[in-house]
Amino acid sequence: MGKKIRLTTAQALIKFLNQQYIHVDGEETPFVEGIFTIFGHGNVVGIGQALEQDAGHLKVFQGKNEQGMAHAAMAYSKQMLRRKIYAVSTSVGPGAANLVAAAGTALANNIPVLLIPADTFATRQPDPVLQQVEQEYSAAITTNDALKPVSRYWDRITRPEQLMSSLIRAFEVMTDPAKAGPATICISQDVEGEAYDFDESFFEKRVHYVDRKEPSERELKGAAELIKSSKKPLILVGGGAKYSGARDELIAMSEAYNIPLVETQAGKSTVEADFANNLGGMGITGTLAANKAARGADLIIGIGTRYTDFATSSKTAFDFDNAKFLNINVSRMQAYKLDAFQVVADAKVTLGKLHGLLEGYKSEFGSTIKELKDEWLAERDRLSKVTFKRENFTPEIKDHFSQDILNEYADVLQTELPQTTALLAINETVDPDSVVICSAGSLPGDLQRLWHSNVPNTYHLEYGYSCMGYEVSGTLGLKLAHPDREVYSLVGDGSFLMLHSELITAIQYNKKINVLLFDNSGFGCINNLQMDHGNGSYYCEFRTADNQILNVDYAKVAEGYGAKTYKANTIEELKAALEDAKKQDVSTLIEMKVLPKTMTDGYDSWWHVGVAEVSEQESVQKAYKAKEKMLESAKQY
């Protein structure tokens, strides 16, 4: 069967990756941009040898933590709208285990990444090898089995010829908009170096065509009838709308029929914040404008959204007794949610075709959209001017910390900077085409409510898995996607401590990133959650054994890595640092000490969490009763 070429399994892998292309809207580009790797005994003499011999066009980066470099790869793919990827190669055992959190993050967000962890010996001759786990009930179990639940596709290669069918399946999954997610191919470390006579045809240029799925006539007719029969429809813009590139169609439909837009975290910056009908974030971390509009809507048009609990306020955000749902999604599974009328098709194409079927229609929102937006902009302006006072200060998160405790934080951290004031000063100062990234803590809520992105695809939030540590690592991925733009990681001290290894990688390869570190000396978001539900402040503040607030010099840590660092505890210092950071060629870190409880609170929203049904604390008993009361009005499924 044709000409053969003798290669090791690892050499065949690298040769194949170099020949993968993607074709979207008439544009054909290489799909695999490069590979992140940390070499260990499981991959250094296999994949390492193959890369050293001939990496082709693949860019190779040495990561510092397997989870971190996989986050960077995911962020790159997400920012490139899933049209390019990086592969990730790790050694066996702990290196592979470190991929689990990153794989879960990519899976929850439907982002394609190729994970290539090494595996134990296929021959089992030297078993148990270094970093191999042993189970009494099966010799076939390895650490890599932990990646099965968090991979869209998973395979183990124990013979060289298995690689061919496995790679074809993996790339089919990664290039399918409906199924996109992490593909994991585990390669036994002895098999990496084993040679085989591969068919040369396997290494020919392979183009993966991503054609836009068209809606059927039935779907279009049903969707148009639903919209025309509604009085107050609302468009919920999800990540699928961004990946589809549906900005123009969303604006056209919203303007023509006076339909307000609200956004999920993944959908934010699909349409600019200053578009008149864009009411901002929806749900638990949403704006008052969006949540008010949602309560009055009689039709929710979900465009590429998964309807997470944060978007639906745990299924209390809408008038479920009367409102109907129209879901436009390439994923049939997602389209089925909330008893919706389903259009399983591409968002951009569907909206374009729907636009022509709604002639003469106008919603009854009238001037309400403008009124809601103006009301919210006034609140946003107020939050930009919050000033701390040492007496009678009421923070946004009320009734948690006394004035004495807030003053203690101000004294120890030597700051009076409120978080919302700092965030909005940053939004005002950075260049409009800069890209910001965040993932966990209180900052995603502040960002979804307050951040104005007026250039499309400049807001990058990982809020499907909300994985602490994604922020700094992901910023490296942003820089690889946008080498000529400033990229900013907005990160709390909790997430920074969890993982920031790829800051060193960014410095090492001269890929400038900017880390904006908000330090309130604790896990502030979860501290709010525990206290909101009747508990005390328990092990969420960063305090010493003798109850003293920790004051860590994060700027000195980053300086030791080689970053240009700044300390900014006033708005004047912050703006000056931001302007100076723009002039730098090296990665920067701006450390801001911010006061706890000065992040935004929720607006007309509710989050269902597991409150203790039995407690000696009256406050917890009260919180449980309140939760049960809210569930009476929540949709059950």
Swiss-Prot record:
Reaction catalyzed: 3D-3,5/4-trihydroxycyclohexane-1,2-dione + H2O = 5-deoxy-D-glucuronate + H(+)
Gene3D superfamilies: 3.40.50.970, TPP-binding domain
One cellular component (GO) term of this entry: acetolactate synthase complex
EC number: 3.7.1.22
InterPro entries reported in the protein's UniProt record: DHS-like_NAD/FAD-binding_dom, Myo_inos_IolD, THcHDO_hydrolase_firmi, THDP-binding, Thiamin_PyroP_enz_cen_dom, Thiamin_PyroP_enz_TPP-bd_dom, TPP-bd_CS, TPP_enz
Family: Belongs to the TPP enzyme family.
Protein's job: Involved in the cleavage of the C1-C2 bond of 3D-(3,5/4)-trihydroxycyclohexane-1,2-dione (THcHDO) to yield 5-deoxy-glucuronate (5DG).
Protein name (record): 3D-(3,5/4)-trihydroxycyclohexane-1,2-dione hydrolase
Domain of life from the UniProt record: Bacteria
Organism annotation: Bacillus licheniformis (strain ATCC 14580 / DSM 13 / JCM 2505 / CCUG 7422 / NBRC 12200 / NCIMB 9375 / NCTC 10341 / NRRL NRS-1264 / Gibson 46)
Cofactor binding, per record: Binds 1 Mg(2+) ion per subunit. Binds 1 thiamine pyrophosphate per subunit.
Residues engaged in binding Mg(2+): D493, N520
Cofactor dependence: Mg(2+); thiamine diphosphate
Pfam families attached to this UniProt entry: TPP_enzyme_C (PF02775), TPP_enzyme_M (PF00205), TPP_enzyme_N (PF02776)
Keywords associated with the record: Hydrolase, Magnesium, Metal-binding, NAD, Thiamine pyrophosphate
UniProt cross-references to NCBIfam families, sorted A to Z: myo_inos_iolD
Gene Ontology molecular-function annotations: 3D-(3,5/4)-trihydroxycyclohexane-1,2-dione hydrolase activity; acetolactate synthase activity; flavin adenine dinucleotide binding; magnesium ion binding; thiamine pyrophosphate binding
Positions of thiamine diphosphate binding: E66
Gene, per the UniProt record: iolD
Pathway in which this enzyme or protein is active: Polyol metabolism; myo-inositol degradation into acetyl-CoA; acetyl-CoA from myo-inositol: step 3/7
Upper taxonomic lineage: Bacteria, Bacillati, Bacillota, Bacilli, Bacillales
Entry's Gene Ontology BP terms: inositol catabolic process; isoleucine biosynthetic process; L-valine biosynthetic process
